[in-house]
Amino acid sequence: MQFHEHPHEHPHHHEHVLDRRSALRLGGLGLGGLLLAACAPSKSAISSTSTELSASTTTAATVDVASTIASSTSAAASQATTSSTAAATVLNTLPGFDEFASTVKVFASGDYWQVESNGLPAHNMMVGITSWQQQVPLPMTYKGSNAWQLPKQPALADNPVSAKTSLYRGAIALAVNGVPIFNALNNRGEDAFLVGELDKWGGHCGRADDYHYHVAPLHLATIVGSAKPIAYALDGFAIYGSTEPDGSTMKKLDAYNGHIGTDGVYHYHGTTTYPYINGGMRGVIRGVVGDQVDPQPSAKPFREAGAPLQGATITNFSSPKTGQYALEYSQSGKTGLVEYTVSDTAVAFTFTSPTGAVTTEKYTR
């Protein structure tokens, strides 16, 4: 099924992703004790610690992932790839992100790629959520000192960090459309997708009204193709879709949802079963602070966290114009509405409950 992206920040209103929830329920997932990264950890959660992982503790030489992917991508398109073409790709961007160049900016800075975005996808959002915390998608300021950072030369770690025992908060990967990807399970050890907390694209909003995925955005493969990644883990290694970069059947994966490719470089895959995305950090990272990969951008809440709205199902989300949004939901056979306008400094809400009661709220950001 064809999936479209448009170079503007507001989503269009067509649904193009098949609902995998019914199929996944048949799979029987082994659920661990992860916390949903978008939610506050429970009291039983592992206390915040700081674990520094040295870049010298590696089991493989560092590799230039951009150069390797660029070579593979060019080879798939033409047998006449030149080294100068690959070098130009390395200097300009990371493969995959180039398909979203109008809304996602990538540039080299020292040993890292800096990635800037507003965190909102071009596809629609929120539709299909049946377990809703009353948070809504807002554009974020992932830029400048708050941009995403991906190592230019990732390396395998002697001591990988498993998402089953840590990384309970924050992102563990970044999709090539600029949307962060969080861990998969909520603070009750439940699969967030299977229990209805995610929309048809595998995302929802966190406490800061920040939209993010909790499963692999496999739908992006229809845009970038099999030869390019759909995301990158925060350790710098690429995440491909459900096939190998050459289009062949996906090979056996390790506990982190990855393996060494035919090019000799490690990469992850997105899957339709847990862990869906990278199952942790197989590569070297600078540290884990407060149960999240550090450093990474912050998304700070500007209002009190929402509470679960029992019996509500989100039925529609739209953006009639830039900076204006509307979310519709059904509850007990009636329709509720959240309309809001966003500027650089403020957010104004109008809430219409299923009973018809109207309230307004305004916040500074």
Regions found by a protein language model. Give the residues of each.
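N-terminal secretory signal peptides
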Residues: M1-S22, G27-A38, I46
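Short, low-complexity, disordered segments immediately C-terminal to signal peptides
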Residues: A40-I69
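Solvent-exposed N-terminal domain segments of exported/luminal and surface proteins
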Residues: V65, I69, A76-R188
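Extracellular glycan/ECM-engagement signal in secreted proteins
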Residues: A86-L138, V224-A357
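A mature extracytoplasmic/lumenal domain signature
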Residues: P154, L185-N187, V215-H219, T243-P245, ...
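Extracellular/lumenal glycan-associated surfaces
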Residues: N177, R207-L220, D263-Y274
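Active-site cradle of extracellular carbohydrate-active enzymes
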Residues: D199, G203, A208-Y240
